[in-house]
UniProtKB/Swiss-Prot annotation:
The keyword rRNA processing applies. The keyword Cell membrane does not apply. The gene is rimM. GO terms for molecular function: ribosome binding. Pfam families: PRC_RimM (PF24986), RimM (PF01782). This is Ribosome maturation factor RimM.
Amino acid sequence: MSEQKIEVVGKLGSTYGIRGWLRLYSSTEKAESIFDYQPWFLKIKGQWQLIELESWRYHSNDLIVKLKGTEDREAAQLLTNAEIGVDLSVFPKLGEEDYYWHDLINCQVVNLENYTMGVVTELMETGSNDVLVVRANSKDAFGKQERLIPFLYKQVVKRVDLSTKTITVDWDAGF
């Protein structure tokens, strides 16, 4: 898989029934969108393996899936908790000021005074806007361990340079 870059989009949960079905936990914005990204790879024993989706449906409020070659409960149990990944090439291209969260993770964040705020470890969705969770450097001059910085392009986030993995923000280092 060296030529492919895999992004995790979900995870298999516990088995459902005796015919090889599994619960599915989707990381996509809309749970059903996970089915738009094919083919799937499962991380089994640390290795990504191509897997084919046979069928899916809702059971109550849960998504459940049937994978080809998984015919019974015992076979399905071997896949419990496996991460589901897709090749990054299947994601649609975005506009100039739009970014996938996975592109922003591990970016260095600096403010307009060129103070290094830390590194993006995750993003949160708040309803009104996304928020960068920035882990501060261990020797942060302001004693911060973590900063929450709203991802408001042009207002707070002034520049994103994915080639250097740098995000420039208009944000006080003391916050």
